[in-house]
Amino acid sequence: MRTIEIRKVSITFLDTDAIVNAANEGLFAGGGVCGAIFKAAGYEQLQKACDRIGHCDTGSAVITPGYNLKSKYIIHAVGPRWKDGRHKEPEQLYGAYYKSLELAAANHCGSIGFPLISAGIFGYPVHAAWRQAFDACGDYLDQHKDVSLHIVFAALSDEIIETGQKTLLESGASRYKIAGRNDWARLDMPEQRDTFIFQRTFTAQQMASLRHGHIPRQMEDKWFWFMEGDTLFAHRSWTGFCIFRIDFKPDNHHVVTVNRNPDQYTCTSTAEDAQKLNELLNWWIQDPYDYYHEWLDETADALKAAGKNIPEKHPSIIIR
């Protein structure tokens, strides 16, 4: 799973394999996030571990056990104090994140939790701090395609979270964002609906791809989907109509609710629905999801149904 998400939670409550402490160069307990982590981990034992290390340069990171935390490790990352942005603050903040990710991977972590480093008492502007965070995380995942790492950012301020969500969508790391209901314009499932049982087995990796969801980015992106708990909501990107809702079940007999408003979805047969859904899921469980060739397939099928002559589905559609 190679994903990025933002949660409204105290970082000390995360159960990721590692959490990151917004540390200082002396590695002593401070205020804010740092103080909360020391308190939750156990001040005396964590301070002893930090004292053995002694120092960490700004823009770098070191690692200690997590002690009383749910996380196995604490990565202590030292971000810069904000001056004016012209004293290597962006490079140092980027480095603190990147080094933290390297340490997480080196210690076989599958997940890591970050605070918004330097945005508290160190005074780094929130939007700029988010930008460096996402640039570093996106670059790391791009450059280490063999690493499976789920990245969680923990924050408590609604304003900081909202800024983070917007900045993530604007950044190059947006493809790693876990989709949520507020990431795209959408409509709820109408009252006109049917349900049927859909039997299919999914691997853990395939379910991880579905849980990642998908936020459309190109005109050819025809679907927006996201998961809440064990329920997947699939919306048409151009209209926002909710076409399918899938409640995944442990026995692999999943409950599907399908849109029956003829102005939103024209299919009326559950057999056709099941076939269509199965085809869609074959695309959506891919990592990465190939929306463009899904669009080619779907467009080709529609043109064929309309009696058009289509010599080839791939790599292009030609109408005679």
List each model region and its residues.
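A structural signal for short hydrophobic beta-strand segments in well-ordered beta-sheet cores
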Residues: 61, 225, 246-248
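Negatively charged, low-complexity tracts enriched in Asp/Glu with abundant Ser/Thr
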Residues: 173-229, 317-319
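Glycine-/small-residue-enriched capping loops at alpha/beta junctions
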Residues: 1-106
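A short, structured loop/turn motif at beta-sheet edges
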Residues: 107-110, 227-230, 249-253
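Polybasic, proline/glycine-rich intrinsically disordered low-complexity segments
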Residues: 252-320
